[in-house]
């Protein structure tokens, strides 16, 4: 019996892939790189972010040298545009069904709690989740150098004493699918987000 559904946020519940690509291209331009297409983004995007930028052909030294510029430009453009994003098609219906079924729902994300909560309120779905597992404040960037949200989820699961077969991990990237497979959770892959469909197979 499923007791917990853990949703990724960006690209999974929030339809922000186009906004993210626009922000990424602004950051690339700021450090003298060429813009990328949606398909290039979906093929390259990964966590930690250093791996993503390496997939785009950048060296670690280049990334570290320009990290602050990349982060500042990306977040500046993203936050200016994110209020135009809606939930993914069908998301609200699924969330309401799970709530009516008394299944615990959490968001586990590489984003930060204040900005996620602000969007949840704007989208009128803030009362549906039991917890947001993410960076505690804007500006934290643990995901730049390592995967960390799986540890937040695993700690929550241990606290609640859920068993692996009682958990579903839902996401639009390899990260959420790999987390599920590693720890024995069921997985649901959402296409049309940050990764290509073939990467989610």
Question: What does each of the following model-derived ranges do?
Answer:
Residues 2-93, 97:
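N-terminal helical cap/lid subdomain that shapes the substrate entry/recognition surface
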Residues 15, 171-172:
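Acidic di-acidic motifs
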Residues 84, 113-168, 174-183, 197-198:
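Substrate-recognition "cap/lid" segment bordering the active-site pocket of phosphatases
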Residues 99, 181, 201:
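Anion (oxyanion) recognition and catalysis
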Residues 192-201:
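Short, glycine/polar-rich helix-capping loops at beta-to-alpha or helix-loop-helix junctions
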């Amino acid at each position: 019996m499923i007791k917990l559904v853990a949703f990724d946020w960006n690209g999974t519940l929030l339809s922000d892939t186009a906004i993210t690509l626009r922000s990424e291209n602004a950051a690339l331009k700021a450090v003298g790189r060429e813009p990328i297409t949606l398909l290039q983004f979906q093929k390259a995007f990964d966590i930690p972010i250093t791996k993503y930028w390496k997939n785009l052909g950048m060296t670690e030294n280049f990334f570290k040298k320009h990290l602050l510029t990349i982060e500042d430009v990306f977040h500046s453009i993203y936050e200016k545009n994110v209020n135009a994003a809606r939930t993914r098609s069908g998301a609200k219906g699924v969330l309401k069904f799970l709530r009516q079924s008394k299944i615990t729902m959490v968001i586990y994300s590489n984003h930060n709690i204040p900005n996620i909560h602000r969007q949840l309120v704007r989208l009128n779905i803030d009362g549906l989740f039991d917890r947001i597992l993410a960076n505690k404040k804007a500006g934290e960037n643990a995901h730049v150098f390592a995967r960390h949200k799986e540890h937040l989820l695993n700690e929550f699961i241990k606290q609640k004493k859920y068993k692996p077969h009682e958990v579903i991990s839902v996401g639009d990237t390899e990260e959420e699918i790999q987390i599920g497979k590693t720890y024995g959770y069921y997985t649901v892959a959402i296409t049309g987000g940050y990764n290509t469909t073939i990467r989610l197979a």
